């Protein structure tokens, strides 16, 4: 692994003039900063948001060529409808996510975290792939280290539900998805690349929406003491979206929570090509969306 000298920030973004980027979950937190900075660099940016009103409020504070379109990753019909509205796109940033929420199901019957964080983005990426010219960046987390994929019980029907383990599973799935996507793109002879990023420990609205009366106040207090800004947390995503990288790069702060931005390691489970392939095939069956190239 090599490190960019100094501390890379969004100020180092190259020009995105003439390019189109989609950022999911762009109405707040890391997604908002990612969209704003890409627009500042000259990109045409589509803010893909479940709540259009919040998306429009975020858009009002941005300059450049930006627009909001509805996308609910917990509803595959919404994912398909969104994909149908998209023309050519250069960069897709799979940023949206939920964290450690109480047990609930998506509209399609998936456990909400694996459904939103992984399966929704899996379907979106494959539906858009014929229209993507450059790369796909998926936001994972250090919490992938706590994750384990249960291919027989992805939706926590047989296991006692654990909000944090379910979150870790979904973030591990993001990395396995990225690796298998990169492999399939290369095998298809595509010039499109796939990368992942993690923000370190950034204070965002995710920690305030766990739905846990004990956990939420704890994380909000931790944010004030230890959390970096969303501006800092978006830097790995922006790096992954803009730099010349080997396929399947994983970008984050060097020291985990903080540090210079560059390639970082991942857990042994996240490096399993066998599990990545099995998860991909299961995801195709569950979403009824296949690799299109």
Feature-to-residue mapping (PLM):
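Short, contiguous pre-domain boundary segments
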Residues: 2-8, 259-269
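C-terminal helical subdomain
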Residues: 170, 219-263, 273-277, 281
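Rossmann-fold NAD(P)H-dependent dehydrogenase/reductase core
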Residues: 1-210, 288-293
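Short, flexible, mixed-charge acidic loops at enzyme active sites
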Residues: 149-155, 209-214, 251-260
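C-terminal amphipathic/interface module of NAD(P)-dependent oxidoreductases
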Residues: 267-293
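Pocket-edge positions in alpha/beta enzyme catalytic cores
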Residues: 47, 71, 225, 268-271
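A short C-terminal helix-loop "cap" of Rossmann-like NAD(P)-dependent dehydrogenase/epimerase domains
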Residues: 157, 213-222
């Amino acid at each position: 692994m090599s490190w960019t000298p100094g501390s890379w920030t969004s100020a180092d973004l190259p020009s995105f003039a003439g390019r189109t980027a989609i950022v999911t979950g762009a109405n707040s937190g890391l997604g908002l900063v990612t969209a704003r900075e890409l627009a500042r660099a000259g990109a045409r940016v589509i803010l893909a948001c479940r709540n259009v009103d919040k998306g429009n409020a975020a858009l009002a504070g941005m300059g450049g060529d930006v627009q909001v379109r509805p996308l609910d990753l917990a509803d595959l019909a919404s994912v398909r409808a969104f994909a149908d509205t998209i023309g050519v796109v250069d960069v897709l940033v799979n940023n949206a996510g939920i964290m450690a929420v109480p047990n609930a199901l998506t509209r399609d019957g998936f456990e909400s975290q694996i459904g939103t964080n992984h399966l929704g983005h899996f379907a979106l990426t494959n539906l858009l792939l014929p229209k993507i010219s450059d790369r796909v960046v998926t936001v994972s987390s250090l919490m992938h280290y706590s994750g384990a994929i249960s291919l027989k019980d992805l939706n926590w029907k047989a296991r006692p539900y654990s909000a944090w383990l379910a979150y870790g599973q979904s973030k591990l799935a993001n990395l396995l998805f990225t690796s298998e996507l990169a492999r399939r793109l290369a095998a298809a002879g595509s010039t499109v690349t796939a990368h992942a990023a993690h923000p370190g420990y950034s204070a965002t609205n995710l920690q305030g929406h766990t739905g846990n009366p004990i956990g939420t106040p704890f994380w909000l207090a931790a944010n004030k003491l230890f959390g970096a800004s969303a501006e800092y947390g978006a830097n790995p995503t922006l790096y992954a979206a803009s730099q010349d990288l080997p396929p399947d790069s994983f970008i984050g702060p060097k020291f985990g929570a903080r540090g210079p931005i560059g390639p970082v390691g991942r857990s042994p489970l996240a490096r399993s090509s066998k599990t990545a392939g099995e998860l991909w095939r299961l995801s195709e069956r569950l979403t009824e969306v296949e690799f299109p190239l």
